[in-house]
Amino acid sequence: MKKSVIGSLLALSLVLLFAGSAFAVDINLSVAASLREVVTELSDTFAKSHAGVTFQNNFGASGVLAKQIESGAPADIFFSANLEWMDYLKERKLLDEKSISTFAHNVLVFVGKPESKVTRLEDVIKLEKIAIGSPKSVPAGEYAMQAFNKAGIDKQLENKLVMARDVRECLLYADRGEVDGAFVYKTDAEEMAKNVKILFIVQQDLYPRVTYPMALTPEGSKKAEAIAFLKFLQSAEAKSVLAKHGFVVN
């Protein structure tokens, strides 16, 4: 009798285990580094109301993430910090084109020590070391280079630039005093800066508007939960969270 009861309980446990596994779904997100906090908050909110859904978040430079996806890294939704890397994957048929949409917008700023006399773009040529994200893979760095070129100061800055792997590392260099200032996004400066402050906002006519597109990958388009999460990201609730973190949502 005792063995029978134990056997029944064991069988029931296995049934419950496999039933739970059947409803468990991982959603893999590849996310531009500057979206770390807001996407983490939004994915946590979604998971709380969708039993069995868990998120695997991969944060980094948009170009690095795109190359990872191209190489077969698991990803259901890609969030880029510019249109270029979204187009890169679209051209390679690695995105569900119909799902491409705008997640948010941002602004490029320059941060430095509070006592700094730098108040405009032309002033940065007086500095010795300036951090930007590597333009080859970091959109913030590419935006900065475009601003330098348009302002006609690119030649004066070329030997002063310190390249960072992503925009967060760029901010960290400035915060630790390893550079005299850094070009980062406004949201990063407002949320993460400890020892530096925003010295000026880069004129919008000097670089393309910072746009964060998002899209499902072919794998993600097969997951109902990933599709539902993408829809949630376009909701009024999600936009309220984006605005709270300093992003522009229109």
Regions found by a protein language model. Name each.
Residues 1-7:
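Positively charged n-region of N-terminal signal peptides that target proteins for export
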Residues 8-19:
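Bacterial N-terminal signal peptides
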Residues 23-49, 54, 58-59, 63, ...:
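Exported/periplasmic ABC-transporter solute-binding proteins
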